[in-house]
């Protein structure tokens, strides 16, 4: 029977006893009430999720504790729930988990229940609630929190021993046992990455894990760090799933996008635009070509990664301009080929469309306008089928026009008669200003027989003129597929010093050993160690230093 119901039963029974007038007066030992209370308690213990008590009740118990008043069992449970609670009436007071004065008393209360085997599941759930609710990005730096973690792990065994039959919630806790260890989140993250079915929603309810818990951050940190352990084809297969996670977990969306884009940049696919990844990045972070958005991008990814996406957009715009927006002429493959060579150097591109392109209701045009909303301008002053393309390379803006017979115009940034981000541009006043352009080049003589390594005709003249402006064609960097199984000797220089004490220990541990070391932490990845042959001594030491084993890859370990 719960303490409240038991007290009520005793008070009513005592009142009736004292007011009894004769032998015929109603006698009632309240068996039905006691039975109902017992049934309620059993149902409570069977429940998958134990509801969190109101903050008002938790704070009342915390205040009684600080006033050194004697607490009932129920009040102690409220204290266990409130170890991470801030009291708005006393903003200068630390939470109990950070209170060196009062936490020892709480610690003794928990230890007493553990030693006497009287810790109930509701008490254990209350401790779990505080453990996961503690607001600290690195909770392990708090020794009181670490003590609590140990009590919860021990307390589970006490609770389990008191239950005759194993409950479904117990199986979930035991499967995700690492949540009460320094390796918290490892099992869940590996399970998620492997695409295995999981009981994450059940765990969230059973272990009283709030949405704001440090555990979710830990899970995603571990999960995203493991992307670096995947080979490129494996990673490519995971991108759609990662984008699904980004849509589902808004709180970690930026972290997921940062890790995915960075990993893609370091893959062999870098120069191949990933349509879904590009669209998601534009939706969440806007256009990296716009000056107003570049600071936002640089909050999340390095400049080379942002440049990769800008290159994707430039290639996309060039393809659309010379194919979809060719006006009333044929596709100019020569101009498309020439400018694609510079796409990876283009920091900004803008398509300026005439009336026909804006009003065309063909499915290709409708889709194009929808996907590029906010990235298109209106062209006035020309023929309805005219379109223009603005490209920024280094300090210059280059303007091409749809259809043949138009020269290319180039302007120095800061001296151009137009703002390339303007919503409306005039073909004659802005884009074809002979007096302010630094270059005006026709597309003659005709270019024929060109290929990836050879240019002909007018392209040769263009290359010469661009070199005078300090612009040279740079072949796209060849990115080799790295076989993670390949063997190479380990040396101290393979490991960068980021955490001096730990990284120096790792250097000395792997030096001269038969293993492969890959340190990509400065690129947002992980430090991984693959032992070529089993070595129990080294593997134990790696675990002690905080490394985690890689799922399905024996003798391989990683650390962030």
Curated annotation (Swiss-Prot):
The keyword Lyase does not apply. Changing residue 400 to A: No longer resistant to SECphi27. InterPro entries: ZorC-like_t1 (IPR049659), ZorC_EH_Signature_dom (IPR028943). It comes from the Bacteria. It holds the Pfam family EH_Signature. One of its GO terms (biological process) is defense response to virus. Keywords: Antiviral defense. Disruption phenotype: When this gene is missing the Zorya system does not confer resistance to SECphi27 in E.coli. NCBIfam families: anti-phage_ZorC. Component of antiviral defense system Zorya type I, composed of ZorA, ZorB, ZorC and ZorD. Expression of Zorya type I in E.coli (strain MG1655) confers 10,000-fold resistance to phage SECphi27, 100-fold resistance to lambda, and 10-fold resistance to T7. While most T7 infected Zorya-containing cells undergo abortive infection, a minority produce viable phage progeny. These eventually accumulate to a high multiplicity of infection, leading to culture collapse by 2 hours after initial infection. ZorA and ZorB probably assemble in the cell inner membrane and exert their effect there. This is Zorya protein ZorC. It comes from Escherichia coli O139:H28 (strain E24377A / ETEC). The gene is zorC.
